[in-house]
């Protein structure tokens, strides 16, 4: 390995370990709490599911990175297809569960008098379940694309050098275009959640100012915490999606590809750390664990 690959390896392994520790921590804490209380809140259920799928996403990204750094000349069709399917599934559920968490915060925290908003708020659990199940259509579409890519790769193995180059280029472009189109929907939903939360917060602050009350009330703090979680998800997800698209266009450019994979890996690792810090229960357990480790 050259110097760049060594640097990328160190950063990638740091993100991988950090992300796995954070997501395993979330899963274990919420599981223990569920066993003790014999119930689990909707928010904890969503966050736990996110953590589990992010562990899978991190492993899929690590495998992809490993194949380009250590075995770039190995052309194993089965491994490519398996890696593509694993990444597609974990990426899909990570993305949509993050979007559903944004919607959950919006409906639980925002205060609007709109009749449709109030109706959806009353049926929130059912609404989120329908969205989660409905999003599976996007997953089926993407897995269909992976299958088409498999057929293309089989043709590549049987074709000449020119055919190989053209088919690689076509499948890469098609894959990235489909990825972009599919991810517009959850990104748009999350963006709307951010804007509506900001509008709800500004309306609340105006009411507080009108009645001569301070701005540091409970509702304001809850709005701010929710915005921190949702905005961080949106920004990290946008960065991650951009890295996936750029890396898909730069498969032949190893430095660019490795850089994009490294930057993109911060999304499933970094946002989970933000979730821990923004959740009172997880934060308390984490701080308690740190104090015990220092003793």
UniProtKB/Swiss-Prot annotation:
It comes from the Eukaryota. It is a multi-pass membrane protein. Coiled coil: none annotated. One of its GO terms (cellular component) is membrane. It is found in: Membrane. Residues 27-45, 102-127, 199-228, 277-295 are cytoplasmic. CDD domains: 7tm_TAS2R43-like. Pfam families: TAS2R. Glycans are attached at residue 160. One of its GO terms (molecular function) is bitter taste receptor activity. Several bitter taste receptors are expressed in a single taste receptor cell. Putative taste receptor which may play a role in the perception of bitterness. This is Taste receptor type 2 member 120. It comes from Mus musculus (Mouse).
């Amino acid at each position: 390995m050259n110097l760049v690959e060594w640097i990328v390896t160190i950063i990638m392994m740091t993100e991988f370990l950090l992300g796995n520790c954070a997501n395993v921590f979330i899963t274990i804490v919420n599981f223990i709490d569920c066993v003790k209380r014999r119930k689990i809140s909707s928010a904890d259920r969503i966050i736990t599911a996110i953590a589990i799928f992010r562990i899978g996403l991190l492993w899929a990204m690590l495998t992809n990175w490993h194949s380009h750094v250590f075995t770039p000349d190995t052309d194993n069709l089965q491994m490519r297809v398996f890696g593509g399917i694993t990444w597609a599934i974990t990426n899909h559920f990570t993305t949509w569960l993050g979007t559903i968490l944004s919607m959950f915060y919006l409906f639980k925290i925002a205060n609007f008098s709109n009749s449709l908003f109030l109706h959806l708020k009353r049926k929130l659990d059912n609404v989120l379940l329908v969205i989660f199940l409905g999003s599976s259509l996007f997953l089926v579409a993407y897995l269909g694309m992976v299958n088409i890519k498999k057929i293309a790769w089989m043709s590549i193995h049987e074709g000449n050098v020119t055919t190989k180059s053209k088919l690689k280029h076509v499948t890469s472009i098609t894959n990235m275009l489909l990825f972009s189109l599919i991810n517009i929907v959850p990104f748009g939903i999350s963006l709307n959640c951010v804007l509506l939360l900001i509008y709800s917060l500004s309306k609340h602050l105006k009411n507080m100012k009108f009645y001569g009350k301070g701005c540091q009330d409970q509702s304001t703090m809850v709005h701010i915490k929710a915005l921190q979680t949702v905005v961080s998800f949106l920004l990290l997800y946008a960065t991650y999606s951009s890295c996936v698209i750029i890396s898909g266009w730069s498969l032949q450019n190893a430095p660019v590809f490795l850089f994009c994979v490294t930057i993109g890996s911060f999304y499933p690792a970094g946002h989970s750390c933000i979730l821990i810090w923004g959740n009172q229960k997880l934060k308390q357990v984490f701080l308690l664990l740190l104090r015990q480790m220092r003793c």
